[in-house]
Amino acid sequence: MHRPAAFWIDVGVKTALIGLLAVGAFSGLHQFEGKAFGWRLVTYPLAAVVVPVAWYLAGRRPPFPYGADIFLTLPFLVDVAGNALDLYDSISWWDDANHFVNWALLCAGVGQLLLRTAVGPAVVFGLVTGFGAVTAILWELAEYFTFIRNSGELATAYTDTLGDLALGLTGSVVAALFTAAMAQRARAGPAPG
């Protein structure tokens, strides 16, 4: 059976995620200490199967949304790869870049799913932005409860959290703008030619 390239990219992203999670959870390397890898080991694989499970439960309407699945899994892979390479502790701007880029990727995935519906561009923009804002808040709450409240980072957590929320929201808005433009283009139909 011939599989599209997107299938193999999707499998590669998920395989890399699981492999790096195992390294983070079981290697004993210093860069994973205090980073809530037990929680990541449980929640990240669940996040990686949201699209396939939802697609299956929704009746498997073809084609499979590979783009959405890849976009929704990539932020988790980027996070774990950044920890594996010790980038959060060795590059001062890495965490900030991740909040922008990962929320752009996450929201692009949600946008790809919305493009499969009849929702108009303005609603797409609002839903993608809202999803990004809510998930950024939930992420920061999870960070606080899993490792910040009992760490040396607590003293600077408020300022860092505000910056992370702003960057996550900005990434969400960028993804929402692109997705709304794609929805508008799809509504307009093919260009005369």
Label the model's feature ranges:
Residues V101-A118, F125, I148-G152, L169-A183:
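Membrane-interfacial alpha-helical segments at the cytosolic side of multi-pass membrane proteins
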Residues W39-L41, P62-P75, D95-V101, V123-L127:
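Cytoplasmic-side transmembrane-helix entry/capping segments in multi-pass membrane proteins
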Residues P52-W55, P75-G82, A108, F131-E143, ...:
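Alpha-helical transmembrane segments of multi-pass membrane proteins
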Residues D86-D95, I137-V173:
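Interfacial helix-loop-helix junctions of multi-pass membrane proteins
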Residues L29-F37, A84-W94:
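Membrane-interface helix caps and helix-loop-helix hairpins in membrane proteins
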Residues E33-P52:
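Loop-to-helix transition at the N-terminal end of transmembrane alpha-helices
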Residues M1-A16:
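N-terminal membrane topogenic signal
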Residues R3, F32-A36, A54-G67, T117-V123:
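Membrane-interface helix-boundary motifs at transmembrane edges
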